[in-house]
Amino acid sequence: MAKAKFERTKPHVNIGTIGHVDHGKTTLTAAITKVLHDKYPELNESRAFDQIDNAPEERQRGITINISHVEYQTEKRHYAHVDAPGHADYIKNMITGAAQMDGAILVVAATDGPMPQTREHVLLARQVGVPYILVALNKADAVDDEELIELVEMEVRELLAAQDFDEDAPVVRVSALKALEGDEKWVKSVEELMDAVDESIPDPVRDTDRPFLMPVEDVFTITGRGTVVTGRVERGVVNVNEEVEIVGIRPGTTKTTVTGVEMFRKLLDQGQAGDNVGLLLRGIKREDVERGQVVVKPGTTTPHTEFDGQVYILSKDEGGRHTPFFNNYRPQFYFRTTDVTGVVTLPEGTEMVMPGDNTDISVKLIQPVAMDEGLRFAIREGGRTVGAGRVTKIHK
């Protein structure tokens, strides 16, 4: 029995199961927790299928999503695993980023091969920037014909290649059900799958290693000291006496120096990703900076007004619009901390977008917003969320 010791220093990786309905995503998730629990009992608890399947509701950017989070460890890594039971839940999660993925396990039933949702999930994974996909060919115990299973594997590889994923990614034949029942051969298959996950999904770049960015939530003046901007550091690290740049909302950018970093009324040497801090800025007046701008490492982020996005539009039942929208729709786009009005252009051949649809759109904002590809936003009408999306391409 291999002993793995608990280390907080293990790399932490977020993964998820994706694929067509009834191909066994949730069963596989349960099988992984059971197999790893049996292999490293002191590191893992086992989660039954129905515990995962009854996914709790979460609200993310005003959208309700059913999603299950389980965690487990291999010898090498600590994993947080998300499983969205319904197809609509999966799409909403991918677009709103309720649960970010560093990699995904694409579950394909060997008995069926790739199905419409398989393709849709892989396409979405590409659009929302999931870095890596590997494959679990599930229900492999139910296919005796080696040629048939090889054919399915080829189809899956073609599907990955078509979306620029690694077509040589591991494809592991598993039977989640048999593994849950304790069948030795198939337990081993799930262990092999997790070895492949350990080896092939790259270590994520930690937020603290990326260039500094903090969205401005509030601005106030401290008499005798100057102007303070507050917010939660989104990524990177900022040190006292470092130069920063204020970007977005207004034309041009402003450079300044951080003369102090405060958290909970204590002075710090630095603020890092995840911290809620106040930054004291040299030579900046209260009216020079406003909510909705971002403070960044100079030259790392630029303001833009024109972009393409992939969006999910809430259905009427979810509190969204009751009617479709058409070309030149003008809602507000909520980026990080503020709303900016924009004009929507629909893709060629799309007349209208119905509540409950997901679609690509092009947007022209009336004010520039600091953005990178992958940035998420909500679509709002008078403060009410009617959709969510992410930037897929920046034009200007």
From Swiss-Prot:
- Keywords carried by this UniProt record: Cytoplasm, Elongation factor, GTP-binding, Hydrolase, Magnesium, Metal-binding, Nucleotide-binding, Protein biosynthesis
Name all tr-type G domain ranges: 10-205
Q: InterPro entries, alphabetically?
A: EF-Tu_GTP-bd, EF-Tu_GTPase, EFTu-like_2, EFTU_2, G_TR_CS, P-loop_NTPase, Small_GTP-bd, T_Tr_GTP-bd_dom
Enumerate the Pfam families for this protein. GTP_EFTU (PF00009), GTP_EFTU_D2 (PF03144), GTP_EFTU_D3 (PF03143)
PROSITE patterns hit by this protein: G_TR_1 (PS00301), G_TR_2 (PS51722)
| Chain segments carrying region G3 | 83-86
The residues that the entry says bind GTP are 19-26, 83-87, 138-141
**What function does this protein fulfil?**
GTP hydrolase that promotes the GTP-dependent binding of aminoacyl-tRNA to the A-site of ribosomes during protein biosynthesis.
Assembly with partners or alone: Monomer.
Record protein name field: Elongation factor Tu
Quote the gene name from the UniProt entry.
tuf
